[in-house]
């Protein structure tokens, strides 16, 4: 599975966890069916293990917004991206940023992709 697909599936699992208060294992199983992808699982598990810290990074970068007012898709995507940016050294920030914008265009809308771009641009240093 390519990393883009792993990110999309991780987003879907995180969305299910957020929306339905589903367990991490159940969400991964629902999304992956009989497949397995270590990177996708690493993303979902990493976001959930560091969710409070990730939210604390996101919140101050939301101009005139509160984290609880974000759509579940946008919040899940921001968490996923911040996890990659802050916790994974093998993913350049610009790659994570660009992937997030492209995925937002698929799962959200143009306005959300611009919003996500703005938030992540404040969080992600260009040089990693």
UniProtKB/Swiss-Prot annotation:
Pfam family, one: NusB
CDD domains tied to this protein: Terminator_NusB
Keyword field contains NAD: no
Biological processes annotated in GO: DNA-templated transcription termination; transcription antitermination
InterPro entries according to UniProt: NusB-like_sf, NusB_fam, NusB_RsmB_TIM44
An example Gene Ontology CC term for this record: cytosol
Gene Ontology MF terms: RNA binding
Keyword Transcription regulation: yes
Cystine bridges: none
Keywords recorded for this protein, A-Z: RNA-binding, Transcription, Transcription antitermination, Transcription regulation
Xref: PANTHER family: ANTITERMINATION NUSB DOMAIN-CONTAINING PROTEIN, N UTILIZATION SUBSTANCE PROTEIN B-RELATED
Role, per record: Involved in transcription antitermination. Required for transcription of ribosomal RNA (rRNA) genes. Binds specifically to the boxA antiterminator sequence of the ribosomal RNA (rrn) operons.
Family: Belongs to the NusB family.
Name used for this protein in its record: Transcription antitermination protein NusB
Native organism: Listeria monocytogenes serotype 4a (strain HCC23)
Encoding gene, per UniProt annotation: nusB
